[in-house]
UniProtKB/Swiss-Prot annotation:
Propeptide: 21-44
Origin: domain of life: Eukaryota
Family that this chain belongs to: Belongs to the conotoxin O3 superfamily.
Protein name, UniProt field: Conotoxin ArMSGL-021
């Protein structure tokens, strides 16, 4: 094989290695972003639940969740 052929094959191999390495980095970043989003969402939900419980506790009722961002209080929660 000529030197030119060896150089072309080496270049193709390098391009393949670099692109596969970049794809792996993007997948890892996407996965990390998904984990951060899940954690953030659970933190927001927990805070909203605590606020709902405090709000309903003042009315001596049970917090049944949030509806349109407003706490829903009742003596007995259905469903």
């Amino acid at each position: 094989m000529s030197r030119l052929g060896i150089m072309v094959l080496t270049l193709l191999l390098l391009v393949f290695i670099v692109t596969s390495h970049q794809d792996a980095g993007e997948k890892q970043a996407t996965h990390r972003g998904a984990i951060n989003f899940r954690w953030r969402r659970s933190l927001i939900r927990r805070t909203a639940t605590e606020e709902c419980e405090e709000y309903c506790e003042d009315e001596e009722k049970t917090c049944c969740g949030l509806e349109d961002g407003e706490p829903v209080c009742a003596t007995t929660c259905l469903g």
